[in-house]
Amino acid sequence: MNQTLLSAFGTAFERVENAIAALREGRGVMVLDDENRENEGDMIFAAETMTVEQMALTIRHGSGIVCLCLTEERRKQLDLPMMVENNTSAFGTGFTVTIEAAHGVTTGVSAADRITTIRAAIADDAKPSDLHRPGHVFPLRAQPGGVLTRGGHTEATIDLVSLAGFKPAGVLCELTNDDGTMARAPECIAFAREHNMPVVTIEDLVSYRQAQERKAS
């Protein structure tokens, strides 16, 4: 990742700390991955705090595929089958079947309906019957171990919201340009500045977590 672009957001450690602080304040975060991987930026939010306005922003400026990152434990609690048995996607992205809240939504497409679906899925006492399948929210199963196991946006989202003190559930969506192309680092950084989002890379988060583990041992 081009460090010149990122230097305005502090050191790698500071970028992670700023991301954690933003999530605690109810703001979104821009998470960039490696230029040699997907080379994209995802807007991420804590599932517990995401607002209808933030969802509307995400739908308006994102790919439209709004994903709810969950742990394997939560996936089992909700009895969500994986979308395919044999995952042949380039990065092994862990999509489950799509979901909709069983109650409190109309078509399920609006920002408010998607928030209702997310709240239903992350409720402490959530059960499979609280959700209909398919729907307009795309759950993603994170790998245990987070970014230290898999350097994906799914795991980064779970790691960041957990570090911020929230339950391990977060929302992500890839940022796109107005012409429909994928936003790359310069566009992602400009968007983040405009919308008061800190910028952090998955590489930053890997380093941060490795340092945490060294300290703990």
Curated annotation (Swiss-Prot):
Pfam families: DHBP_synthase. D-ribulose 5-phosphate binds at residues 37-38, 42, 150-154, 174. GO terms for biological process: riboflavin biosynthetic process. Transmembrane segments: none annotated. Its cofactor is Mg(2+); Mn(2+). Binds 2 divalent metal cations per subunit. Magnesium or manganese. Pathway: Cofactor biosynthesis; riboflavin biosynthesis; 2-hydroxy-3-oxobutyl phosphate from D-ribulose 5-phosphate: step 1/1. One of its GO terms (molecular function) is 3,4-dihydroxy-2-butanone-4-phosphate synthase activity. The record marks 136, 174 as: Essential for catalytic activity. Its EC number is 4.1.99.12. Keywords: Lyase, Magnesium, Manganese, Metal-binding, Riboflavin biosynthesis. GO terms for cellular component: cytosol. Belongs to the DHBP synthase family. This is 3,4-dihydroxy-2-butanone 4-phosphate synthase. It comes from Cronobacter sakazakii (strain ATCC BAA-894).
